[in-house]
Amino acid sequence: MSSSPSPFGQNEWLVEEMYRKFREDPSSVDPSWHEFLVDYNPEPTTDSSASENGQQTRTAAPKAPPEPAPAPAPKSQDSKSQAPKQDSKPQESKPQAKAKPAESKSSTKPADAKSEKSGKSGTNGAAKPAAQPADDSDQNQVLRGAAAAVAKNMSASLDVPTATSVRAIPAKLMIDNRVVINNHLKRTRGGKISFTHLIGYAIVAAVKKFPNMNRHFAEVDGKPNAVTPAHTNLGLAIDLQGKDGNRQLVVAAIKKADTMRFGQFIAAYEDIVRRARDGKLTAEDFSGVTISLTNPGTIGTVHSVPRLMRGQGAIIGVGAMEYPAEFQGASEERIADLGIGKLITLTSTYDHRIIQGAESGDFLRTVHQLLLSDDFFDEIFRELGIPYEPVRWRTDNPDSIEDKNARVIELIAAYRNRGHLMADIDPLRLDSNRFRSHPDLDVLTHGLTLWDLDREFKVNGFAGAERKKLRDVLAVLRDAYCRHIGVEYTHILEPEQQQWLQERIEGKHEKPTVAQQKYILSRLNAAEAFETFLQTKYVGQKRFSLEGAETVIPAMDAVIDQCAEHALDEVVIGMPHRGRLNVLANIVGKPYSQIFSEFEGNLNPSQAHGSGDVKYHLGSSGTYLQMFGDNDITVSLTANPSHLEAVDPVMEGLVRAKQDLLDKGDTEDGYTVVPLMLHGDAAFAGQGVVAETLNLALLRGYRTGGTIHLIVNNQIGFTTSPAAAKSSEYCTDVAKMIGAPIFHVNGDDPEAAVWVSRLAVDFRQKFKKDVVIDLLCYRRRGHNEGDDPSMTQPSMYDVIDTKRGVRKSYTEALIGRGDISMKEAEDALRDYQGQLEQVFNEVRELEKHEIEPSESVEADQQIPAKLATAVDKSLLARIGDAHLAVPEGFTVHPRVKPVLEKRREMAYEGKVDWAFAELLALGTMISEGKLVRLSGQDTRRGTFTQRHSVVIDRKTGKEFTPLQLLATDSDGNPTGGKFLVYDSPLSEFAAVGFEYGYSVGNPDAMVLWEAQFGDFINGAQSIIDEFISSGEAKWGQLSDVVLLLPHGHEGQGPDHTSGRIERFLQLWAEGSMTIALPSTPANYFHLLRRHSLDGIQRPLIVFTPKSMLRNKAAVSDIRDFTEQKFRSVLEEPTYTDGDGDRNKVTRILLTSGKIYYELVARKNKESRDDVAIVRIEQLAPLPKRRLAETLDKYPNVDEKFWVQEEPANQGAWPTFGLTLPEMLPDHFTGIKRISRRAMSAPSSGSSKVHAVEQQEILDEAFAP
């Protein structure tokens, strides 16, 4: 008998089958086989093995295979192995029968398990018996195809002298780490890792240390040789099921496995298995196997001695994974208590001619060591992108369960406190070699090991249980705190809030429905397609794209949707320019045509007002309709400048105004307008206004019931890396000051972002507090589209340039899970792109308008003529009476009582001082139904103890607000008016921004902010520059906020002197605001009332007095309130009410503010009839006509001076010195200045120097 083996070994049956198909129909065979099969020449399987039907069995042999042919293990009980599925365990495979050697001139049944059960041959080609023999007679059958190949190769294998090494290896570490790996894969890209993957990779790694195990024996020219292949080609035994249900074994090679990392090894492994099952293996896949892996453990075999085929040096058998036999009857609890783990037996059957027993034994020992090694699993975890440390092999700790109970409780607390440090939240993973870990979160730190995983401990109600296995405790903790969401909440002081969050974070999260997943995908499609479209159509134009952070769109959508679910009234969005156009299009619903028109520069002149602004600063509003509900909600986006975070307090003020208009109160049903604030990571950590605005969150005068903060954390600030941008661990640490929960979310997981967004709204509704969502993502391009970020962050952008977008990765995840088909995904994206293309083409066809210089907005709002601001005397009396209408039993402070009594007296008899004139103005507005809001530092009492708008009970601390009595008329009916007066925090930037926003949100309210001293207004300079002075011109955003800035030179030093008149005058243009420096209480009264009644929405800047508050000359008579109106230019009373002769005047001193009283006093002292003093009460807009009319009354004037306290380069002169001669050349040509010298500081730091300087001004003014 000739039994020379085929170079294809046990794969010979497959070659035969391919050849048969090729002869019948070449197109039925994969083209990769054609070249081989054309030259294929079948040869007889045996000398003479005629079957019962007279046919002869033949086998195939190739002419000259390029490499040694594969020689897989024979199909026997010990060696046949089905390649494990990715999620299978060894014991899950079905048993396989043992093959017997072929015998001469007789045919035996192939020992295939399914063949034995079915009574059929192991191959499709086996002939049936010619006649059915008697029941007790033997049956003969010719072996063909696979069965014949098995028989022949088993016989040939007897020529190989083999020996076998056996080693039992602890499997517990492999089991536990596989659980961690597969759970991670399940949450992310899908798929599973099998034990065979791990063992196979360990074998390849061990071969690198023992390359002799990869050699094979060969005779060359009749001489024995040991052949050392260039690479390790690991042969995998793969069990295939034919169409008739019969199973056959092929052995295909993972080529060059020694050059692969674990991820590449898995990909090659899965490719081989997939192509084997799809019938796509080629001849190349069967050639060159150098060492084989077979896994009979899948049927429970503890260990086997598989046959070694020619061309290989060793075959490794994997046995079943079992507890030691003596413990297989023990309970799980007993096994856990004893620390007993499962074992897996590996065998190394090797060619004893070239490999010795010691080498084989050391080889298995190395595999053993690798499968328990920290470094081995570290490499695997890093390759799979698992950010956590693997389970470590450590000796069991013998401490008592009672002692370990406390350690488990400590571990739970540690995860709640520090779990976020281990969370997988960075989509870039720039430090791919670093595991997310912390010593407090390591079980080893707590004296626990992998042997404790299956032991039960007391957990005191954790996750709804009193006792839990440590494995289950860790599963809950890691799912809650260490996945794609990191949570910080233990800094919150209120136990109820912590408990509420714990229950939701540690509870099982429901997976989104398929419909919800498709909706999330649609939002990502919209976000990405919008940016891609703009990038394609408007190359190089700045738009500050959202690319890399597209998850912002579904996250914002979820916030708004959940607000609608709670039946709230409105969501107001404030955000910087990054991604703003995307938000306008896909969240607010701004028409694409309008956005594209702005890119085209196609502006309609009839709609253009003022200077305008770049497209990524503009605001808009729309209505959001729930996708999975019946509610809708208004959505608005506030305009913003490029000054990052400056919009924060503005938006909060706007929201508070809307809430006050709804007037639902501080109740469960209140705060139905929700602020949604977007931030950048660098700005959130770096801009002080963030902390100022956060500080407003829980204050009575400022709270809005909780803001949802969404940080678009692209891990860079223009070119500044996080290490240079913040000293804290997170950019969000500043938010801990107000006890806000903080969620760090991986931007590559849109489902996690949506879940957190909804939770944030629920928390806000429950506790009326801020919530912070830190969405970690990246910036696909530079700070703008023309920037190259690789110049400063080369490593980061090496990663970003090769990174797939979140839309693509999420789409693949949905397709991989079978939630949607590829066609559905492509159709959805194509539909959205089609919409954009259609609108783009429509915009291109729109009428083009010639670009013209922008027009002033000044003419858009004109003060009505003859506006009456006087009031009836009875109303003044009623306000005076209100100051003494204290509640019964109320104890007024002994120093305040005289003030209240004096006010009642002034209301009836006159000589009204400044503070009371202000309260009279506000009181009349309240009585007329106006909401008046007054705030500032020390505003309720007044910096100079002048206002006392709120009176405090000396004994109980209760409050009494006299003007609130004006909210009802004399008959007790509500007027609709309100008086809201608050002391602000020690802030200017946020406080002024808030009041500006409030005035925008409620145009009908009278909103006033008072500085402690006018000097401190420069702390709010960004708000003044970006909003107050230019908001109307840039965005058409109207405000009539009032700033009260105490101003005046009184020797208190450079920081308690100036409200910086010069700066406001420099900013003034286009009627953008009214700037006034009134000098009488009555004129101040009428100024405020005119501002309230004129219907003009423009800010009012008032420089208010300090020492003049108590100047006995600075008072007003009752009829000045009942008969007069605001007068922008004032003459001396001696000319308007007395007998002063204007014809005697040769010198006019123009001035403003408190210095008027000093000039008058000097004039009277010297009896200077030749000098007249004219006050300009309104500095801007300059009252040109009124000023000219006043000057014309003095026909003999030959000298005109502008007199001011301020230095020459400050105050009104830098503006007036230029504009007055231009505006009224006939009146002001040659006008001269009298002031302090030009100074870099507003004033001298010495009161004595101040007095000398002040005297010099007066001396010069009245010099002969």
Curated annotation (Swiss-Prot):
Q: Where is the composition biased (Pro residues)?
A: 63-73
Record carries keyword Coiled coil: yes
Task: Give the residue ranges for region: 2-oxoglutarate dehydrogenase E1, N-terminal part.
Answer: 1-41
Output compositional bias ranges, type Basic and acidic residues: 23-37
Q: How is its activity regulated?
A: Alpha-ketoglutarate dehydrogenase and decarboxylase activities are inhibited by unphosphorylated GarA, and allosterically activated by acetyl-CoA, the main substrate of the TCA cycle.
Active-site positions, per UniProt? Answer: 352
Segments carrying the region annotation (2-oxoglutarate dehydrogenase E1, C-terminal part) are 374-1264
Q: Where is this region: Linker?
A: 42-102
- Show the coiled coil region(s): 819-850
The region called Succinyltransferase E2 is annotated at: 103-373
Residues binding 2-oxoglutarate: 617, 642, 1056
Q: Where does thiamine diphosphate bind?
A: 578, 642, 644, 681-683, 714
Query: What GO annotations for molecular function exist for this entry?
Result: 2-hydroxy-3-oxoadipate synthase activity; 2-oxoglutarate decarboxylase activity; dihydrolipoyllysine-residue succinyltransferase activity; magnesium ion binding; oxoglutarate dehydrogenase (succinyl-transferring) activity; thiamine pyrophosphate binding
GO cellular component: a single term: cytosol
Keywords of the record: Acyltransferase, Allosteric enzyme, Coiled coil, Decarboxylase, Lyase, Magnesium, Metal-binding, Multifunctional enzyme, Oxidoreductase, Thiamine pyrophosphate, Transferase, Tricarboxylic acid cycle
Q: Which residues bind acetyl-CoA?
A: 1074, 1090, 1125, 1128, 1178, 1185-1186
Q: Which CDD domains match?
A: TPP_E1_OGDC_like (cd02016)
Q: Which Pfam families match?
A: 2-oxoacid_dh, 2-oxogl_dehyd_N, E1_dh, OxoGdeHyase_C, Transket_pyr
* The organism's place on the tree of life at top rank: Bacteria
- Comment block on domains: Is a fusion protein with two major domains exhibiting structural features of an E1 and E2 protein, and a short sequence stretch of E1 localized at the N-terminus, which is connected by a linker region to the rest of the protein.
Q: So what family is this one in?
A: Belongs to the 2-oxoacid dehydrogenase family. Kgd subfamily.
Q: How does it assemble?
A: Homodimer. The 2-oxoglutarate dehydrogenase (ODH) complex contains multiple copies of three enzymatic components: 2-oxoglutarate dehydrogenase (E1), dihydrolipoamide succinyltransferase (E2) and lipoamide dehydrogenase (E3).
Q: Would you tell me the protein name for this molecule?
A: Multifunctional 2-oxoglutarate metabolism enzyme
Q: Which gene encodes it?
A: kgd
